[in-house]
């Protein structure tokens, strides 16, 4: 396998419980609400990284269009809800993301903190991609299947971008590969503790 394929393989070590997609379809208004706020938080996270690392030209150039894309996707989810006569609900605490944020290294150099943040974002995008794929394959509504296939493709691209940025700013590839594996191992154990919920994307 080539280095590029190895680098970009999702590598998730525990698949989502297949029952989750059916649960999500039954609670569509709740899952769309959570999805909308996931897009909003992704927008905010990209802006935050740009603010923290304004002199990292490649990061700024690559994340700037993602800010626009993520906010546009928030609006797409809202529009889809309105078409279906649904109301955006309250934002909920994302246990999955909170746990990953706690796993991030906060001490050390700014470069180490940046690499860890990029890897955390890459993992969130990878899991989102996997879940969007489940929805695109299992939801009965063909329009929603297409809707979530589009999001799956988008998240796959964001995952690759975040991981590639981590490699770009790291001092060596071995460090990134080792830390990425630590994230994957941590996420596997985390997934074992989180019960599938119909009102959560993660």
Feature map (PLM): residue ranges:
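Non-heme di-metal
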Residues: 1-202
């Amino acid at each position: 396998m080539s280095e590029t394929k190895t680098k970009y393989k999702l590598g998730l070590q525990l698949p989502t419980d297949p029952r989750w997609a059916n649960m999500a379809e039954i609670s569509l208004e709740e899952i769309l609400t959570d999805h909308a706020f996931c897009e909003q938080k992704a927008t905010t996270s990209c802006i935050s990284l740009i603010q923290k690392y304004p002199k990292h030209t490649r990061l700024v150039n690559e994340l700037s269009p993602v800010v626009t894309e993520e906010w546009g996707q928030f609006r797409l989810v809202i529009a889809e809800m309105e078409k279906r006569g649904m109301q955006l609900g309250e934002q909920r605490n994302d246990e999955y993301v909170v746990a990953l944020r706690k796993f991030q290294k906060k001490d050390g150099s700014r470069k180490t903190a940046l690499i860890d943040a990029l890897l955390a974002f890459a993992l969130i995008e990878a899991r989102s991609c996997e879940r969007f794929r489940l929805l695109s394959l299992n939801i009965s509504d063909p329009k929603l299947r297409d809707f979530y296939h589009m999001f799956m493709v988008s998240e796959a691209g964001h995952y690759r971008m975040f991981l590639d940025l981590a490699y770009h700013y790291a001092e060596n590839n071995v460090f990134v590969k080792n830390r990425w594996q630590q994230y994957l191992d941590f996420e596997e154990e985390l997934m074992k503790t989180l019960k599938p919920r119909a009102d959560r994307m993660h």
